[in-house]
Amino acid sequence: MKRDIDFNQAPLLLIWEITRSCELACRHCRASAENRRDPRELSTEQGYRLIDDVAKMGTPLIIFTGGDPLQREDLEDLIRYAKGAGLRVGTIPATTPRLTRERLVSLQKAGVDQVAFSIDGATEAEHDDFRRVPGSFALAMQGAAWARELGLPLQANTVFGSWNVHRFDALAELVASLGVVFWEVFLLVPTGRGSELQGCSAEQVEDLFAKIHAFSKAGGSKFIIKITEGQHYRRYVAQHAGPPTPGRRPDFVSVKAVHAGNGFCFVDHVGNICPSGFLPIECGNVREVSVIDVYRNHPVFRQLKDASLLQGRCGVCEFQPVCGGGSRARAYAVTGQLFAEDPACSYEPASLAV
C-alpha cells in the first residue's frame, strides 16, 4: 500500500468500531467490551455516510473492528459498500463461536481484503487466560486454518506487556506457522481494562525491539511485522541500520510513521471521532460533523500533527524526524499530558548527554 498520502489531509487508515459488544472479556481491552449491543450504535445508513467521507477524504483503507464485528448482521453490507467506494477493507473478528467457516466465506464473497485474529499466548493456556474465555485459542487456530484454505490474507495481532514480553520467540514461532502476511505487534497502552495491566518497561521494549529486528534480519520472517504504539522502533532500526546504501533510503525513512491523529483516525461505536482507540479524546461525532473536517481542522488533530509541541526527551531528540515522537496515546494515558515524552522509550537524546 502506498504511503504518499499527505497526513495533513487524510489518514492512511481509519478504524471504525462498528460495535463494542463481544463475548470475550480480554484483560487488555481498550473498549472494556461487554456482551450486549448498544442501541446507540451507528446504523447501516449512517455507516454508509461515514464510508463515503472516508473515501472522499482520500484514505485508502478502512478497518471494521469491535468488540466483535461479527455481531453486526450488516457487516457484509458495510464491506460491499466500502469496496464499491474504492476502499481496501479489513476486519478483526473475535474468536468466539460466531466465527465459522461459513461466515468467513460470506466475508470473502462480500470483498474483504484481509482478516485479523488476535494471538496473545504461545500456548492454549496462556492465550485463553488472557482472553478469559476457554476455547478462544482453538478457535483462533481454526480460523487461521480456514483463512489459509480459502486463500484469505491473514494478519495476527499480539499485545505485549510485562506478562508475555519474555515469550516473543515462542509467539514468533507460532505466528510464523499460521501463514500470515502481517504480524501486528501492539505495545500495551493502559486504557480501558488495560489500565489494570503492567506494560513493558522502556528497557523491556528495547529488548523486544532487538528480538524483532534480529528475527526480521535473519530471514525468519516471511511476513511483515508492524508495531503499533511503538513508533520508536524506527529509532532502533536507524541506530542499527549500518552504512547506508548509495541511492537508497533506509526502509525506516522510506515510509512515514503513523500516529494517532496524524495518519490515523478512529470512530467509535456511537460515532465519536477520536485520534485513536488508544487515545479516546472525543473531537466530534459523525452524526453532526464530517470526519474530514475533524481530521483536518479540529485543534486536537492539528496539534497532534505539530512536532514542535513535543516535550521532554521527545521534544529534543535527534530521532524525532524518524519516529515522530513515539506514542502520544501512551504519553497521555500515563501522564495525562498529550505531548509528554513516551515513557516506553529509553533513549537519551544526544543533546541531553552529559
Show the residue positions of the predicted features.
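Radical SAM enzyme [4Fe-4S]-AdoMet core and its adjacent flexible, acidic
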Residues: L42, R88, Q108-A110, S118-D120, ...
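Flexible mid-to-C-terminal extensions adjoining Fe-S/redox cofactors in radical SAM and related proteins
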Residues: N272, F278-V354
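Residue-level preference for beta-strand/loop junctions
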Residues: A10, R148, H259, S308-Q311
